[in-house]
């Protein structure tokens, strides 16, 4: 009987030790920034998450709620009404101030941008895990590209947008700010892409396949060329429809006069892309 008690106590002790070890493990949803960026796999996962949030232009701009569909014939017929009803209503003029819309890029891209800024601020070299300072700098440059790209998507869709050149502080009294003028946004994105086109590799052909699809200097030049062409177009280059559109500080959100020099700037950017 005593032997049975001793065996029971011994097994109970082992079981409790095992439970203690299991319960002491912190779940993933309580990870801190320090825990994430002190680990190579989690650091790389964070960067992948910034990439993974790249939206699909078709579904975020044109889809069921997309106002682009009002001027686009690339839309299903009446037989598709049960799936594309809202877009069809927009096309035939059945839309009102109360019509629904999808915030899509407006609400999601600032989250994507903040995620990239968090990486830039917190990521650091992990030499004991095979992550050099050069590796980290390239990954941060990739985040800078994604920030520029996400902002480009926003101004393409909405024109003038709120802008943060870094992490937004929730205690900042200027957190709720007006929209930065369209041309100023273009200039900022342009400067970022020009700088990054000199830092990022042109391709990853000699790298592991895990780098396929990552930001390159060619991507920088391509986004820049497309953006500057858009910025030169009559839609945002002296469009009289935007006359008088101002922020609370009195700044015009869009250029009030047509500037033909923007076409030259766009042409030069596209030539640079072609010759790259």
How should each PLM-predicted stretch be described?
Residues 147, 151-156, 160-167, 210-222:
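Aromatic-lined, polymer-binding surfaces characteristic
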Residues 1-28:
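Bacterial Sec-dependent N-terminal signal peptides
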Residues 44-58, 80-158, 173-209:
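Conserved, well-structured interaction surfaces
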Residues 26-32, 90-100, 249-250:
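Acidic/histidine-rich, surface-exposed loop or edge segments in extracytoplasmic proteins
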């Amino acid at each position: 009987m005593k032997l049975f008690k001793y065996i029971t106590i011994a097994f109970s002790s082992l079981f409790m030790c095992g439970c203690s070890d299991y319960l002491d493990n912190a779940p993933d949803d309580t990870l801190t920034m320090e825990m994430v960026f002190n680990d190579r796999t989690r650091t790389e996962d964070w960067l992948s998450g910034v990439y993974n949030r790249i939206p699909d232009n078709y579904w975020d701009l044109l889809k069921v709620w997309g106002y682009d569909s009002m001027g686009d014939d690339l839309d299903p017929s009446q037989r598709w009404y049960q799936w594309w009803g809202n877009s069809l209503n927009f096309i035939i003029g059945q839309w009102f101030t109360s019509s629904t819309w999808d915030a899509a890029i407006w609400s999601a891209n600032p989250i994507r941008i903040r995620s990239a800024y968090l990486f830039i601020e917190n990521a650091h070299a992990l030499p004991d895990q095979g992550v050099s300072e050069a590796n980290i700098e390239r990954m941060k440059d990739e985040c800078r590209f994604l920030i520029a790209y996400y902002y480009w998507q926003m101004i393409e869709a909405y024109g003038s947008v709120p802008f943060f050149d870094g992490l937004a502080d929730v205690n900042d009294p200027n957190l709720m700010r007006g929209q930065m003028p369209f041309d100023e946004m273009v200039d900022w994105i342009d400067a970022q892409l020009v700088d990054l086109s000199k830092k990022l590799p042109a391709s990853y052909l000699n790298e592991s396949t895990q780098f396929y699809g990552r930001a390159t200097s060619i991507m920088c030049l391509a986004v820049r060329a497309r953006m500057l062409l858009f910025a030169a177009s009559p839609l945002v280059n002296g469009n009289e429809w935007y006359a008088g559109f101002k922020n609370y500080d009195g700044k015009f959100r869009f250029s009030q006069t047509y500037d033909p020099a923007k076409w030259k700037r766009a042409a030069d950017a596209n030539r640079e892309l072609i010759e790259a």
